[in-house]
């Protein structure tokens, strides 16, 4: 383990966080709020940590997969701890475990909250919650690759450790250029949504917060009734479209920008992703039609909720916990499917589901025709055995974490639906679950042990499991010989 480079990278991350903490501080100045000292103190802590860890650049800047995974896991943990300080210092969330839950939920783009009254927060804290979504959506380490001049080829380990999905492809020969392209697309879509929301009459502050939350597929909002507060079909439709857009693999946007339209529209995962959205929305629309005035209105709300859940954003226009069992079951299924690999969404990812389906089909064909030689393909290309192996290992690890978390949560929760969906929604970074943790409820009733488990699940789900698991593996901490 190259501890020097890990230390140096964490220091840079703290420096970046101190800059982001100035945004809510400025908001507190604009609105004349008392929370200003809390954000300035947190920014000072972060900057001091950066100065302490970055005072000396390491001589050996080489790092590999192990350093990449450890750096990512530690960065996100420290990021959340520092980010929780303003809530505690301001007294808006007095207990640290609750503040940590809220901040981890923000940075991991989960959107689950312990707050019963979001509207009681200051403007500064509202902005900070949504800003954590935007920062966590693409990943602070990916952003750091833009500003930090490290040895070129090795930065792929950072991006692979933090990016959602089975693999990370280069859009440019240099990973720094790839990170810049990703953030340019990310920033551009965020600004575009903000403009469209303003055109629809949404207040500027709300448009900023909603756009940041949508971009990160997070789901934090400024109102207790989420997007239903605005009571505008136009605004809800704009948010629906952008939730779907942010759930698409960003490589497709790069292909479109470089005029490779045919190649972009041939991506199998995107076709499956869009197909699932509209099929599930149609099924739910027919199922909930008696609850609404027309099929058009039922499809409007069904499409919004399907897009919100599959992209793991977590916004809501209605209390879908009151929907029929069939519709709720479909929404829970969408929690596990998730968005596309290479997007800001969570879940298992459509690409993994697609490849697992192809693997099952391959095995069935081999049983029928034992001598038949078949290979799994994606987008016309053969999928390497290593990728299929990593997907199988991921699913096993995912099932293990899910079952263990469910058992621990059930020690202090008697409602099985609440237990199951609380783990499902945090491990998949969705936000709202069903029953006691539904869209109109919160996670504040869970005891500290359960909150700790859910915090781990949110981090593990966001970082694709293995970076967090490696922290508990003794061999990870051995020095390089």
How would you name each of these model-derived features?
Residues 1-481:
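Membrane-proximal intracellular helices of multi-pass ion channels
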């Amino acid at each position: 383990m190259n501890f020097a480079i890990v230390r140096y990278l964490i220091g840079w991350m703290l420096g970046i966080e101190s800059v982001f903490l100035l945004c809510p501080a400025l908001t507190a100045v604009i609105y004349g709020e008392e929370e200003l000292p809390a954000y300035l103190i947190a920014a000072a802590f972060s900057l001091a940590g950066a100065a302490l860890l970055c005072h000396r650049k390491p001589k050996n800047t080489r790092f590999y997969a192990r350093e990449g995974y450890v750096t990512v896991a530690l960065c996100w943990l420290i990021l959340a701890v520092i980010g929780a300080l303003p809530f505690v210092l301001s007294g808006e969330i007095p207990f640290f475990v609750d503040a940590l839950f809220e901040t981890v939920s923000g940075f991991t783009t989960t959107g689950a909250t312990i707050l019963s009254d979001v509207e009681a927060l200051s403007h500064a804290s509202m902005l900070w919650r949504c800003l954590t979504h935007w920062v966590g959506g693409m990943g602070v380490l990916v952003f750091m690759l833009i500003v930090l001049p490290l040895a070129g080829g090795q930065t792929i380990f950072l991006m692979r450790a933090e990016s959602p999905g089975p693999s990370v492809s280069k859009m440019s020969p240099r990973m720094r250029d790839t990170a810049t392209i990703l953030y340019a697309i990310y920033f551009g879509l965020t600004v575009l949504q903000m403009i469209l929301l303003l055109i629809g009459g949404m207040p500027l502050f709300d448009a900023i917060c909603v756009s940041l939350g949508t971009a990160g597929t997070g789901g934090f909002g400024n109102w207790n009734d989420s997007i239903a507060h605005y009571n505008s079909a136009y605004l809800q439709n704009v948010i629906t479209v952008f939730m779907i857009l942010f759930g698409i693999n960003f490589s497709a946007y790069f292909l479109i920008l470089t005029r490779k339209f045919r190649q972009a529209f041939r991506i199998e995962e995107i076709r499956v992703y869009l197909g699932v959205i509209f099929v599930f929305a149609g099924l739910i629309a027919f199922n909930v039609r008696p609850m609404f005035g027309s099929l058009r209105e039922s499809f409007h709300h069904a499409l919004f909720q399907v897009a919100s859940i599959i992209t793991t954003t977590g916004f809501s226009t209605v209390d879908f916990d009151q929907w029929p069992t069939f519709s709720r079951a479909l929404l829970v299924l969408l929690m596990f499917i998730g968005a596309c690999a290479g997007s800001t969404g969570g879940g298992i990812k459509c690409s993994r589901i697609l490849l697992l389906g192809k693997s099952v089909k391959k095995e069935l064909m081999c049983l029928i025709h034992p001598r038949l030689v078949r290979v799994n393909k994606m987008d016309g290309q053969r999928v390497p055995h290593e990728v299929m192996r990593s997907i199988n290992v991921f699913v096993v690890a995912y099932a293990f974490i899910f079952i263990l978390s469910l058992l621990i949560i059930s020690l202090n929760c008697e409602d099985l639906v609440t237990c199951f969906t609380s783990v499902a929604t945090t491990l998949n970074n969705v936000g709202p679950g069903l029953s006691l943790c539904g869209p109109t409820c919160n996670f504040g009733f869970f005891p500290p042990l359960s909150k700790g488990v859910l915090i781990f699940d949110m981090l593990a789900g966001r970082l694709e499991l293995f970076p967090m698991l490696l922290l508990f593996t003794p061999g990870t901490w051995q020095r390089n010989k």
